[in-house]
């Protein structure tokens, strides 16, 4: 395993390996590469954040890579990988897992619902099976999916509202999920993302951190009550859970806005889908990002 890292994080990994606490406890030495041009890997897993992702991908040599996938938030990630490496090398993927990295470089593994990987055409392939086996064997739950685009959009439909509420309330996840006003905004954003996905021919499912298909199928009041009930479950099962967006805000790091909310809004504009709530939240989070750093 080789890790592409920069700055202080690269030094931490070089000196102490990858140190994980929480649901799993281990320290693993790994090879560190600081220059993307020096990376040589058969399978590339992208898990970085920041505005320079496109440039980094473009600087990674494509020839050794047979398969590339990204567990970043949002949907722009797939376009970036396809642009850099070609569609034949790219798999869909999403992470329904959580963690938090501390200043000393240690990572708290706090939620292990799973990582999903699949071919965009739904085919069952050997490369998907091999990657799933490697990840699952490491202790992180992983499984193949024949409807990966549906899962990716379903995750984003839930993530969008949770991200916005995390950086506006700065509260633990369960707290705003149980707030009726916050839950209403989450429901409204999920409905707009669902309309964008439908315009692309993608159907949402309930296989996500929030059951977005059910949220969009009933009345708004029913959906709000459902989100609030899930908030109570979060309070019991993951009381310390904080969105990575809130972690980034507290640490003074840039927020994931343009590849996530921004990308969805651009797709909505292109398709002629009305998204007033998403557009307003995009402006709000951009302002928070600019003024808090």
Q: Model regions: which residues?
A:
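NAD(P)-binding Rossmann-fold cofactor-contacting core
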Residues: 1-24
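Generic preference for hydrophobic
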Residues: 3, 32-33, 117
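Active-site-adjacent beta-strand anchor residues
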Residues: 3-4, 46-47, 71, 146-147, ...
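Conserved active-site and cofactor/substrate-binding residues in soluble primary-metabolism enzymes
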Residues: 8, 51, 76, 126, ...
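Short alpha-helix immediately C-terminal to the canonical SAM-binding loop
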Residues: 10-13, 78, 265
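Internal alpha-helical scaffold of NAD(P)-dependent oxidoreductase catalytic cores
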Residues: 12, 63-64, 84-89, 108-211
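Rossmann-like NAD(P)(H) cofactor-binding subdomain of soluble oxidoreductases
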Residues: 23-108
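NAD(P)-dependent Rossmann-like dehydrogenase/reductase catalytic/cofactor-binding core
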Residues: 187, 191-293
């Amino acid at each position: 395993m080789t890790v592409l890292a920069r700055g202080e994080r690269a030094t931490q990994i070089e000196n102490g390996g990858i140190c994980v606490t929480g649901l799993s406890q281990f320290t693993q030495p790994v090879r560190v590469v600081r220059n993307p041009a020096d990376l040589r890997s058969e399978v590339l897993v992208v898990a970085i954040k920041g505005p320079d992702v496109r440039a980094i991908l473009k600087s990674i040599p494509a020839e050794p890579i047979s398969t590339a996938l990204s567990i970043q938030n949002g949907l722009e990630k797939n376009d970036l990988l396809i642009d850099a490496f070609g569609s034949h090398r790219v798999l869909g993927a999403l992470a329904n897992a959580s963690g938090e990295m501390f200043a000393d470089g240690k990572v708290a593994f706090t939620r292990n619902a799973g990582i999903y990987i699949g071919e965009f055409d739904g085919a069952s392939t050997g490369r998907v099976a091999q990657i799933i086996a490697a990840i699952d064997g490491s202790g992180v739950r992983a499984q193949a999916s024949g409807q990966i685009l549906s899962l990716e959009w379903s995750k984003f439909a839930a993530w969008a509202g949770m991200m916005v509420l995390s950086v506006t309330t700065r509260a633990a996840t369960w707290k705003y999920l149980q707030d009726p006003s916050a839950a209403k905004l989450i429901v409204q954003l999920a409905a707009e993302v669902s309309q964008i996905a439908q315009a692309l021919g993608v159907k949402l499912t309930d296989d996500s951190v929030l059951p977005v298909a059910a949220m969009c199928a009933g009345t708004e009041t029913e959906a709000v009550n459902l989100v609030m009930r899930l908030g109570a479950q979060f309070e019991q099962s993951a009381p310390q859970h904080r969105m990575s967006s809130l972690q980034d805000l507290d640490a003074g790091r840039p927020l994931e806005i343009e590849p996530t909310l921004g990308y969805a809004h651009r797709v909505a504009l292109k398709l002629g889908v009305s998204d007033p709530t998403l557009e307003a939240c995009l402006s709000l989070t951009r302002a928070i990002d600019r003024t808090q750093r």
